[in-house]
């Protein structure tokens, strides 16, 4: 596929909601990001700042945000120790995700989630669907597992400094950085 072919495709921006919000949660200070009722908002602020930058820079035709629903996915059922070593999600973070989903809804940005699948599974499905429909996908995530999805019409925008800097991973960038093709990138 030529660069011109790719440039003429509609663009869908796929956001890994929890991944981006979690990065913002740890990148920004909580001071000054609290409502009068005590609700923390700094993860949402960082997420929306990144989204604003992405919309300005990438000019997507469509945007979808995928979120995790918890620990009841098929992986947890098949392998109970799946992600068992992870620390408990801070309570200050949980409330911010629901607030962020409300803001995205108000902005007209659809959100998807599933009790059976993680957000990155949903993003993989959406990316493949977009490709089959003649679109190109930009996936914004801090999850390197998504590098396996990269091809001539799928690019991963990976945050490297909190929520302010994104690295564009294409097949060439994956090969340059890791000396493997996206399909060879370990899961």
Where do the language-model regions lie?
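Short linear sequence elements within intrinsically disordered, low-complexity coil regions
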Residues: 27-30, 52, 79, 84-87, ...
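Non-catalytic, usually N-terminal nucleic-acid engagement modules in DNA/RNA processing proteins
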Residues: 1-64, 68, 74-76
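Intrinsically disordered, low-complexity N-terminal regions enriched in serine/proline/glycine
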Residues: 25, 46, 61, 78-81, ...
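Extended two-metal-dependent nuclease catalytic cores across DNA- and RNA-processing enzymes
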Residues: 2-8, 33-34, 84-187
